[in-house]
Amino acid sequence: MKALVTGADGFVGRHLLEHLRAQGDDAIGVDRECDVTDAASVLAVLDRVRPEAIHHLAALTAVGASWSNPVEYTRVNVLGTKNVLDGASRVVPTARVVLVSSADVYGVVRPEDLPLVETFRVAPANPYASSKVEAEHVAHDAVRERGQAVVIARPFNHLGAGQSTDFVVPAIVNRLLQALDDGADEIVVGDLSTRRDFSDVRDVVRAYRLLIKSGVGGEVYNIASGVDVGLFDIAQRLRTAIAPHVRLVTDESLIRPVEVPVSCGSYDKLFRATKWRPTITLDESLSDVIDEMRRRRGES
């Protein structure tokens, strides 16, 4: 299958390209050379590649940064999605598309609501999540008005080797490794009272490929582990593995204006459609992040 991946130079995009090629797909990745906010640029890429499958990953994804630039998040995440789907309808109307949304669209939930299912209401609590809700609306319009085969994926938190330090796990790992370098006895962290559902990025990209094959157009699928874990627990595991003597000190300036206390999803619908289930443990994922960041810092 010829597959196009937008946002291919990003953390997930790189893993997805590797997985698709390992499965025998003819996978072509585009990133900054295809400006998804420019309809002509998107059309040119689609006309050149003529994909049978499109994985639309290109997006702004840092939740914290979305508060300072919500307009740009809307431009990239919503207009970008519209341009990809409009272009596909013109050039490759039968192509199957996976739109990568986010579990952040669910917003603040109660513990008794967990694990979240796809029919649960959406109530975005930050500009990033709002942009993803709007992108989902664009996808539903494409399905309803043009009959495009667009499947919406809502991944919960994911992690793995190569993730940016804009995200919590690699950020903590980086600070712990820096503390070892500096001989420091403490690092600053943000709010560790929250609980999140983490999947390994390799499990996540495997789900994307399965959804291209077996997902139903217009349907939404959670990608989740089904288990919520406290960020404090994760930070302690990382501290024990890297620098047990280092204390964790909360810095109020690192706390987001609105924080979702707990998030956890059900992957039952995804399993029914594709037989997907998570295969990589959290401890394996954390170990991979540590090893990769040590290599990146020349500390292997």
What do these predicted ranges mean?
Residues 109-114, 138-197, 201-210, 228, ...:
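NAD(P)-dependent short-chain dehydrogenase/reductase
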Residues 3-20:
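N-terminal Rossmann NAD(P)H-binding glycine-rich loop of SDR-like oxidoreductase domains
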Residues 201, 220, 233, 252-284, ...:
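Conserved C-terminal active-site "lid" loop/helix of NAD(P)H-dependent oxidoreductases
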Residues 172, 214-255, 297:
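Mid/C-terminal beta-alpha module of Rossmann-like enzyme folds, strongest
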Residues 27-42:
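Adenosine-cofactor binding site in Rossmann-like domains, unifying the SAM/SAH pocket
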Residues 40-76:
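NAD(P)H-binding glycine-rich loop region in Rossmannoid oxidoreductase-like domains
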